[in-house]
């Protein structure tokens, strides 16, 4: 295994708002790779400069960073310049998928379904936006993940406060219409869609706390959909990743209405790999252990 992969750096931690989640993801990945006999080492970009990777002779990188500075194309660009292969999507797709607004623009231009939205700023007519999108409305930073800075607005008078909260995290804030239905997530590995996971939060609010620090959210995998319907959604997910230029692995979130209509929400190019994370759960149902999943992701490390 050491000869196959060489010296591997697992990048985790970083300085984004999702640092704590990344620390959990990276520790799990590192333990799995080392357990499989890979010469893997921890590397926190918040504590060490990236150029050290080249100086210390690393052969490839497993990116377990989340949020800005980790899955937005910046680290990927640095690794491209150093000529060190890395896991996941390349520079362009990473930057694009991190931007919820432009991701939606691409999806819509390709005829893919996604909820209606508006970009908010200090001069927005919040009452008009509430009337146009209807209530409830989800408000979130354009460039954050893990529901950081996100709010579910149930009254028009709450919209400005929700924008102010999201604006603490990002200069760009998006308001998205609420779509009622099943919340699903769909991981993919290379050109293969993994089993869908249905997410059932006890209060219907799958926020940061529910994602990583509580056990009261129910995850159904298999998701319970008829095979033909699940396969159609998996095909949609693969197309949604392809039009963004994603590669390697990732996870898309979507809503399925009671009428059976899907709406794409977000694309994650460096999903969580914690004990609560959904990609390992889906892979397990597909017959892959966590160790096998990490090795498969690492095997896909590349440049370009």
Curated annotation (Swiss-Prot):
<keyword id="KW-0436">Ligase</keyword>
<keyword id="KW-0067">ATP-binding</keyword>
<protein>
    <recommendedName>
        <fullName>D-alanine--D-alanine ligase</fullName>
        <ecNumber>6.3.2.4</ecNumber>
    </recommendedName>
</protein>
<feature type="binding site">
    <location>
        <begin position="130"/>
        <end position="185"/>
    </location>
    <ligand>
        <name>ATP</name>
    </ligand>
</feature>
<dbReference type="Pfam" id="PF07478">
    <property type="entry name" value="Dala_Dala_lig_C"/>
</dbReference>
<dbReference type="GO" id="GO:0009252">
    <property type="term" value="P:peptidoglycan biosynthetic process"/>
</dbReference>
<dbReference type="InterPro" id="IPR011095">
    <property type="entry name" value="Dala_Dala_lig_C"/>
</dbReference>
<dbReference type="GO" id="GO:0046872">
    <property type="term" value="F:metal ion binding"/>
</dbReference>
<feature type="binding site">
    <location>
        <position position="268"/>
    </location>
    <ligand>
        <name>Mg(2+) 2</name>
    </ligand>
</feature>
<keyword id="KW-0464">Manganese</keyword>
<comment type="pathway">
    <text>Cell wall biogenesis; peptidoglycan biosynthesis.</text>
</comment>
<dbReference type="InterPro" id="IPR011761">
    <property type="entry name" value="ATP-grasp"/>
</dbReference>
<keyword id="KW-0963">Cytoplasm</keyword>
<keyword id="KW-0479">Metal-binding</keyword>
<keyword id="KW-0961">Cell wall biogenesis/degradation</keyword>
<dbReference type="GO" id="GO:0005829">
    <property type="term" value="C:cytosol"/>
</dbReference>
<keyword id="KW-0573">Peptidoglycan synthesis</keyword>
<comment type="function">
    <text>Cell wall formation.</text>
</comment>
<dbReference type="GO" id="GO:0008360">
    <property type="term" value="P:regulation of cell shape"/>
</dbReference>
<feature type="domain" description="ATP-grasp">
    <location>
        <begin position="104"/>
        <end position="299"/>
    </location>
</feature>
<feature type="binding site">
    <location>
        <position position="266"/>
    </location>
    <ligand>
        <name>Mg(2+) 1</name>
    </ligand>
</feature>
<comment type="similarity">
    <text>Belongs to the D-alanine--D-alanine ligase family.</text>
</comment>
<dbReference type="GO" id="GO:0005524">
    <property type="term" value="F:ATP binding"/>
</dbReference>
<dbReference type="InterPro" id="IPR013815">
    <property type="entry name" value="ATP_grasp_subdomain_1"/>
</dbReference>
<dbReference type="InterPro" id="IPR005905">
    <property type="entry name" value="D_ala_D_ala"/>
</dbReference>
<feature type="binding site">
    <location>
        <position position="266"/>
    </location>
    <ligand>
        <name>Mg(2+) 2</name>
    </ligand>
</feature>
<dbReference type="InterPro" id="IPR016185">
    <property type="entry name" value="PreATP-grasp_dom_sf"/>
</dbReference>
<feature type="binding site">
    <location>
        <position position="253"/>
    </location>
    <ligand>
        <name>Mg(2+) 1</name>
    </ligand>
</feature>
<keyword id="KW-0547">Nucleotide-binding</keyword>
<keyword id="KW-0133">Cell shape</keyword>
<dbReference type="GO" id="GO:0071555">
    <property type="term" value="P:cell wall organization"/>
</dbReference>
<dbReference type="Pfam" id="PF01820">
    <property type="entry name" value="Dala_Dala_lig_N"/>
</dbReference>
<dbReference type="InterPro" id="IPR011127">
    <property type="entry name" value="Dala_Dala_lig_N"/>
</dbReference>
<dbReference type="GO" id="GO:0008716">
    <property type="term" value="F:D-alanine-D-alanine ligase activity"/>
</dbReference>
<dbReference type="InterPro" id="IPR000291">
    <property type="entry name" value="D-Ala_lig_Van_CS"/>
</dbReference>
<keyword id="KW-0460">Magnesium</keyword>
